[in-house]
Amino acid sequence: MIDLQDLNIQQKIADYLADDRLDDINASSQPVIYKDTLYTKYIKRILDIVISFIALILTLPLNLILGIITYIKLGSPLFFKQERIGRNEKPFTLVKFRNMTNATDKNGELLPAQQRLTPIGTFMRKTSLDELLNFWSIFKGDMSIIGPRALPFYYYDRFSDRHKARFKVKPGLECPPWDEKHIKRTWENQFENDVWYVEHVSFKVDCCMIFKLIRYTFDRKTSMMRAQCRKGSFLGYSKDGKAISNID
């Protein structure tokens, strides 16, 4: 039986899908038009600096507590670091508190992520507390408050040209769905929402999305629905051009 949770098998499937259909999808997909405006060049960055600085000050005590708990439960290293795709495909290092053990199977291979997730890690994910250190990435200029979610580099070659347009802007804490019908998380909904954002980014849009992000965080029903929605790992595209995962 094929284990679709195995990263090596996922990569082989992704390579096959890219070779089999990515050229045809690129030839038929709609281009994405990004307009660099006064807001995107200057004002958005100023707002990111101000908001992230305030957030870092306000969350410092909480981050210290989370750091202590993480160290007690998991020891050293304290942080999880991973290279992610930034604006214009430039790499940056995403830093979070560790929330998984390094438990392995009898062959020395790491167990699946869900089996290594600690209770405190589960709590941090459900409450988005694992996102707090991202304010440092925003303050440094690697990320923005609003923008497409930062993804690992091994996804890059799986993207269509249309969806690669999401890298024309900085990644963000979240890019809430503009269309409430797409609140359920699927890769297709997420990527199409990302490219919509790239084409429409403005002060008004960012303000609306910040409000939605706050609402999602504190609305228990919405946050639970989103937390329980599993997307799996992005593998590529179906023959009709829809983004698919290992659980589709």
Locations of regions flagged by a protein language model:
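A hydrophobic, helix-centered structural microdomain
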Residues: 31-102, 208-248
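Hydrophobic structural segments characteristic of membrane proteins
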Residues: 1-29, 133-248
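Feature for secretory/organellar precursors and membrane-associated catalytic proteins
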Residues: 87, 123-126
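Cytosolic-biased juxtamembrane loops and peripheral soluble domains of multi-pass membrane proteins
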Residues: 36, 103-119, 123, 152-158
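Short, glycine-rich, amphipathic interfacial segments at transmembrane boundaries or analogous
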Residues: 19-23, 80-116, 174-193
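Juxtamembrane loop-helix boundary motifs flanking transmembrane segments in multi-pass membrane proteins
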Residues: 27-42, 112, 116, 131
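Short acidic-aromatic low-complexity motifs
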Residues: 125-134
